[in-house]
Structures are given as structure tokens and as C-alpha cells.
């Protein structure tokens, strides 16, 4: 534990070496605190250790788990893309792949003219919120003062 690094690169993202490992991993898009803790436990690492003390072998182990978490023993319900639309596999996407998958999902919904796709096109709320008072766009009309 002598070699401390202030910046640790995991899955193409620079992590803060001064933070606890589980909190440092949340800097990777697509990884929350619960998933980060699971990755630490599966890798056999202490989630509370400083990320700067990771060795290269431990970083490789974390990257392997992130590449295919279900194969390494992380439960299926914890992944962010169970039963993927194209492949049918349980995937956990991170960084740019996650952004692309979300964009493709929205484009597919728009292409098939699903209700959610149309709401995305129009820039309206997708999940059933009311729109009478919120989600208003455009110029606001000011209130004129009463003359004395």
C-alpha cells in the first residue's frame, strides 16, 4: 500500500484517488453507489479503501467485472439494461455506450411512432406528469402594476 496515485484511470475515466473506492467509482457514468459497492465486493476489495491505493491488477479486475457483471456474480436485477432489446442479454452499459443506447432507444420509439416517442419529439414530459402549470415554454408575460 505504499504507491498512492492521486488519479486512477478505470474504464477510460479518471477517478479521484483521495475518495473511497465505492464513491470514486460513481464518477463513471452508469455506476451508482450500490452497483459500485457490489463491484468492490465481487472483486474482493474493501469499498472503503482509498482509490489511490489500487494496483494495476486490481484495476484490471474491476474493468473485467464492469465489462460483464452478471458473469462475475452480480445479480441480474442490478444491471442497467436487463434483457437488452437487440441482443436479449443482461448488460450493464457505462460511459459513451450508455449514452448511445439511450439515444437509440429514443430514436426507435420515435420511428415506430410510440406515444413515448411522440412526447420526446414534442419536448413534453414522457412519464405522465400533468402539463397545465409546469413544462411551459416561451416568453413569460409580466404583471402590469395598478396606476395610482
UniProtKB/Swiss-Prot annotation:
Annotated GO biological process: translation
Family designation? Belongs to the universal ribosomal protein uS13 family.
The UniProt keyword set, sorted, is:
Ribonucleoprotein, Ribosomal protein, RNA-binding, rRNA-binding
Q: Report the GO molecular function annotations.
A: rRNA binding; structural constituent of ribosome
Q: Which organism is it from?
A: Pyrococcus furiosus (strain ATCC 43587 / DSM 3638 / JCM 8422 / Vc1)
Q: Pfam families, per this entry?
A: Ribosomal_S13
Superkingdom field: Archaea
This chain belongs to the protein called Small ribosomal subunit protein uS13
Question: Which function does this protein serve?
Answer: Located at the top of the head of the 30S subunit, it contacts several helices of the 16S rRNA. In the 70S ribosome it contacts the 23S rRNA (bridge B1a) and protein L5 of the 50S subunit (bridge B1b), connecting the 2 subunits; these bridges are implicated in subunit movement.
GO cellular component terms, alphabetically, are: cytosol; small ribosomal subunit
Q: Which gene encodes it?
A: rps13
**Assembly and oligomerization:** Part of the 30S ribosomal subunit. Forms a loose heterodimer with protein S19. Forms two bridges to the 50S subunit in the 70S ribosome.
Amino acid at each position: 500500500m505504499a504507491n498512492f496515485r492521486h488519479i486512477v484511470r478505470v474504464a477510460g475515466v479518471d477517478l479521484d484517488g483521495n475518495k473511497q473506492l465505492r464513491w470514486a467509482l460513481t464518477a463513471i457514468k452508469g455506476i451508482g453507489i450500490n452497483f459500485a459497492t457490489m463491484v468492490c465486493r465481487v472483486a474482493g476489495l474493501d469499498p472503503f479503501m482509498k482509490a489511490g491505493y489500487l494496483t494495476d491488477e486490481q484495476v484490471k479486475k474491476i474493468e473485467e467485472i464492469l465489462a460483464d457483471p452478471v458473469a462475475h456474480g452480480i445479480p441480474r436485477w442490478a444491471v442497467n439494461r436487463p434483457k437488452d432489446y437487440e441482443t436479449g442479454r443482461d448488460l450493464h452499459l457505462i460511459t459513451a455506450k450508455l449514452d448511445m443506447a439511450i439515444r437509440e432507444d429514443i430514436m426507435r420509439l420515435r420511428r415506430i411512432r410510440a406515444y413515448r416517442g411522440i412526447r420526446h419529439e414534442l419536448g413534453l414530459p414522457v412519464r405522465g406528469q400533468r402539463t397545465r402549470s409546469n413544462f411551459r415554454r416561451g416568453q413569460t408575460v409580466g404583471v402590469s402594476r395598478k396606476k395610482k
